[in-house]
Amino acid sequence: MTEYIVTLIIIICVIGLFFVIKNYMFPKLDIVGSSMYPTLIDGERKHSRRFFNRFEDPKIGRIYVYRDPTNKLVIKRLKMIHENFCYFVGDNPTVSYDCRYYGFIDRKRIVALLME
């Protein structure tokens, strides 16, 4: 009986750990607005990957989640890198409020990589 309880506790802990890792390291994001249209559509939900910054450098052409100068989370495509600063632009430039208006963003402000 004791072995059964220990096994059950281990299984519950493993399942709980799986959900914590899945939801914290790979959170789903709601796409709001049309600044990334047609790549991302308003109302879609996409997975992202946190902590990529510690293991790999940002790559031009990928879509990232970062904090803009007002500390708001933003999803845009990386267009240019200069030293530790990144330049992001939306895929729909006529409606996108991006680095064209507020300049380069420190690489440390990147929160996650959007998984496509």
Task: Report each predicted region and the residues it spans.
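Extended hydrophobic leader/signal-anchor segments used for secretion and membrane insertion
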Residues: 1-116
